[in-house]
Design a protein with these regions (language model features):
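Transmembrane beta-barrel domains of Gram-negative outer membranes and organellar outer membranes
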Residues: 1-56, 63-68, 77-79, 110-111, ...
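Detector for outer-membrane/organellar transmembrane beta-barrel domains
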Residues: 56-144
Length: 167
């Protein structure tokens, strides 16, 4: 990775009884750094050459304000969730209206699905870092419906909201 780009590799097992594993690669590029009045903005793509199980794309902005750190983004694919809004990119081209869903066994760039689909969704979070303690409180909104995980016996999320304490 570089100061403006990061990459992630994931290898996930869904159900060992049927040997259901999936790998995916994610790339995120920072478009610009946080400034006094502007948030840091990045664009990312998950599952670049995978089977599409994790595929999502996003644009995300982050801004620190005092002891708080705020994040807000728009996502497609898994990050669209149930779809908060119509995909705004359809206004640019009808190509963005239909999301490719046949990825075969993976291993090939699946650019036909990038930033596409009828819907997009919002995600975000906030964190508060205590000055006097190495502790932060976090709140997150994640619209992912975890369809694959639920289909193989995983728990269905009851809420898109999560809270955490980090120390």
């Amino acid at each position: 990775a570089t100061p403006w780009m990061e990459g992630t590799f994931r290898y996930t097992g869904f159900n060992r009884a049927i040997y259901s594993y999936d790998r995916n690669y994610e790339a995120k590029i920072r478009l610009w750094e946080e400034q006094e009045y502007l948030p840091q903005v990045a664009v990312g793509i998950r599952d670049l050459v995978g089977t599409g199980l994790w595929q999502s794309e996003y644009v995300v902005a982050s801004k620190a304000v005092g002891d708080f750190d705020f994040t807000l983004g728009m996502g497609w694919g898994r990050l669209a969730g149930k779809g908060d809004i119509n995909n705004p990119l359809i206004q640019l081209s009808d190509r963005f209206a239909i999301r490719e869903t046949d990825f075969g066994l993976g291993g090939e760039l699946s650019s036909g699905a990038f930033f596409s689909g009828k819907k997009a969704g919002f995600f975000g979070g906030a964190a508060y870092q205590f000055d006097s303690l190495p502790v932060s409180l976090m709140l997150e909104y994640n619209p992912d419906q975890y369809e694959k995980e639920v289909s193989v016996g995983g728990l269905k999320p009851k809420s898109p909201w999560s809270a955490a304490v980090k120390w």
